[in-house]
Amino acid sequence: MLFYAPFWQGVETLSIERRQALFTASLPAAAWAALLPSLGKELTSQRVSTVAAVLTALFALWQGAQAWRDRSWLSFTRASFHIIMFYLLITCLWFQSWYAIWPLGLAALLPPGHAARLAALFGYVALAKPLAFEPLWLWHRPLPPKEWRELRLGPALMALPIVYALMAWVDGKVRREKRESRETEGNQES
């Protein structure tokens, strides 16, 4: 605890206000960069961070309701995985490469399939940030403006995992509909 004492500034150390102006390598950072010229730094930071927090809370509530209805032994793990992936891909304000470890533990608890593949893909893409994207855009001198970097880095990093997540969601929906259709046909024949 003593090692953290120099960083403690009272209860506001834990508040969201301190973090609402920190944006990097994420979709909210790209939104921040796009809105900055029209709204100004303070208002843009406040609005983007508030929208991200509200979206995260709504998604978590929806996933909690899904897990409550499902009641299988994997429902909590699945909902937790979906929430952490939603947060990292869509609403995380300040993304760092090591955050990609978070979903791996949950994916390991789920049956082989889309979750494990998404977690692995996300890990590879996150590792590409310092190995590919940063040299491509951040090694130039003078350094491009922060707004220019954020408009490109977040969407470039998150595009492939988001596309995969959407494809997995559509695939799951199609499979469920086919299964329900077969069950309905089987019940009608009986």
Model-derived features with residue positions:
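Transmembrane helical bundles and short interhelical boundary loops of multi-pass, membrane-embedded
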Residues: M1-Y87, T91-W94, L110-E177, E189
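Generic transmembrane alpha-helix motif of multi-pass integral membrane proteins
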Residues: I101-L110
